[in-house]
Design a protein with these regions (language model features):
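Catalytic-core regions of glycoside hydrolase
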Residues: 1-83
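Serine/threonine-rich low-complexity intrinsically disordered regions
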Residues: 10, 21, 64, 88-90, ...
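Surface-exposed flexible segments
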Residues: 11, 86-94, 186-192
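A short linear-motif detector with a strong N-terminal bias
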Residues: 55-57, 85-88, 117-118
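Catalytic cores of secreted or luminal carbohydrate-active enzymes
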Residues: 62-110
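Extracellular/luminal regions of secreted and cell-surface proteins that mediate adhesion/ECM remodeling
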Residues: 99-208
């Protein structure tokens, strides 16, 4: 959507969402990432003062970036203006929050370890799926497929670790970035990067 927030919602047949529905692609977000560019004419006002451009949408529509993100299940957006100016504190916070609203939001709901078997229940609290797969716990790969965690749902992943060594042991989990040079993929859970960068600390096993 190259006019995101401006011509996204269903206030005109030629807008992005109606076009998706007409092409029978309105459910494509479940398998393929949706993205686009915030319409250049609203990039500044949507960051500086969102209320000032609410009535600036196409065909009488209102500008609501967050509503457009939720409706399209957008995973990424381009806002060039935000990177070509100096943002004050509230503007930067607003920009970061809008970015955080896009895509997946993985969080560990609970975990347990029994006789070396680790189970991790992961929730997706975002607006879109995680489109790549691959997880590791220590030296064990967890079963399951991150791409199959539906939005608002949870799924349990499990893997077998070597026999528990004596003493307390810290259990970590990470999502492997499919891009060799990509940034670590992070959970929105307390304990992220606590022990090692890129890893979520789940907890410690009981002392034997």
């Amino acid at each position: 959507d190259d006019s995101f927030g401006y011509a996204t919602m269903d206030t005109a047949d030629w807008h992005f969402l109606p076009q998706l529905k007409q092409a029978k692609a309105d459910q494509a977000w479940q398998q393929h990432p949706i993205g686009g560019e915030v319409y250049p004419g609203i990039q500044e006002c949507s960051v500086r003062n969102p209320g000032s451009c609410m009535a600036s949408g196409s065909n009488g529509g209102t500008v609501d970036i967050n509503a457009s993100i939720k409706a399209t299940h957008a995973s990424w957006l381009v806002d060039n203006w935000a990177f070509t100016t100096t943002l004050n504190g509230s503007e930067r916070e607003r920009t970061v929050q809008a970015s955080a609203e896009t895509g997946y939001d993985l969080a560990v709901a609970r975990w347990r370890m029994r006789n070396g078997k680790v189970e991790v229940q992961i929730a997706n609290n975002g607006v879109a799926p995680f489109y790549s797969n691959g997880m590791e716990v220590g030296r064990t790969t967890l079963s399951g497929d991150l791409r199959k965690i539906a939005v608002g749902k949870t799924q349990t992943f499990s893997g077998q670790l070597p026999a528990d060594p004596a003493g307390q042991n810290t259990i970590l989990v990470r999502v492997v970035n499919p891009l060799d040079s990509g940034q670590p993929l992070r959970f929105s859970s307390a304990g992220q990067d606590q022990t090692l960068p890129g890893y979520l600390t789940l907890g410690r096993t009981p002392t034997k």
